[in-house]
Regions:
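Thiol-/selenol-based redox modules, centered on thioredoxin-like
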Residues: 135-182
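A short beta-strand-turn-helix
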Residues: 27-50
C-alpha cells in the first residue's frame, strides 16, 4: 500500500536538482499567444529574474492584478533590469488562456500549458488558488512566493522583492523616487 507522503518526500529530496532545472524548463516551454494558436518562442539569452504569474480568465482578482504587474514589469525593463514575466495559466482551455492574455494586453510569454502540467516543481509553486506570483533566479531558486504552504502572503511582498532584486542588477538604473510597488 502506497503512502500519500511518499511523493512529497521524494520531491523534497530531489528539490535541489528540480530547482536547477526549473529555469531551464520554463525557458524551454515558452509560447507566444496569437489570435488562433500558441506559437513556440525562445529567449536569447533568458532573463536572470523570472516572475511566474499564476492566473486564470475566470479569476476576478487576477484581472484586477494584471495592470499592476504590467506596470512593475514595464518600469523594471525600462530601467534596464534583466527580467520578464511568464504567465502560467490555470484556465481549462487554450482559448480561455488566449482570451485572457488578449483582454489584459499581456506582453509577456506564456508557459506551454501541456508541458506545465508535467512539471511537478512548477505545480508545487502554484499555491492553493490564483493569483500567485513566484520570483525565480537564473539557477531556478525561488526567491519569493505569494504562498507559503497553506498561508497566502499575497502579491505585494513578491512585487517588492522583485523590485529590490531587479534594481540591484548592475545594469539597472531604477528611479529613486519610490516608484516600486506598494
Amino acid at each position: 500500500m502506497r503512502s500519500s507522503w511518499l511523493p512529497a518526500l521524494l520531491l523534497a529530496l530531489a528539490w535541489p536538482a528540480v530547482a536547477a532545472d526549473l529555469h531551464a524548463q520554463v525557458s524551454a516551454s515558452l509560447m507566444r499567444p496569437e489570435p488562433r494558436a500558441l506559437r513556440p518562442m525562445q529567449w536569447s539569452p533568458p532573463p536572470t529574474l523570472i516572475a511566474l504569474y499564476f492566473g486564470a480568465d475566470w479569476c476576478a482578482p487576477c484581472h484586477a492584478f494584471v495592470p499592476t504587474l504590467r506596470g512593475v514589469r514595464d518600469a523594471l525593463r525600462e530601467a534596464g533590469a534583466d527580467t520578464e514575466v511568464v504567465y502560467v495559466s490555470l484556465d481549462e482551455s487554450e482559448a480561455a488562456l488566449r482570451r485572457y492574455m488578449h483582454l489584459q494586453q499581456m506582453p509577456w510569454p506564456v508557459l506551454d500549458p501541456r508541458r506545465a502540467q508535467r512539471m511537478p516543481a512548477l505545480q508545487a509553486l502554484a499555491g492553493l488558488a490564483p493569483p500567485n506570483l513566484v520570483l525565480i533566479d537564473a539557477q531556478g531558486t525561488v526567491l519569493a512566493n505569494g504562498w507559503q504552504g497553506r498561508h497566502y502572503r499575497g502579491l505585494q511582498p513578491v512585487l517588492q522583492e522583485w523590485w529590490k532584486r531587479a534594481c540591484a542588477q548592475q545594469q539597472a538604473h531604477c528611479p529613486d523616487d519610490g516608484v516600486q510597488p506598494r
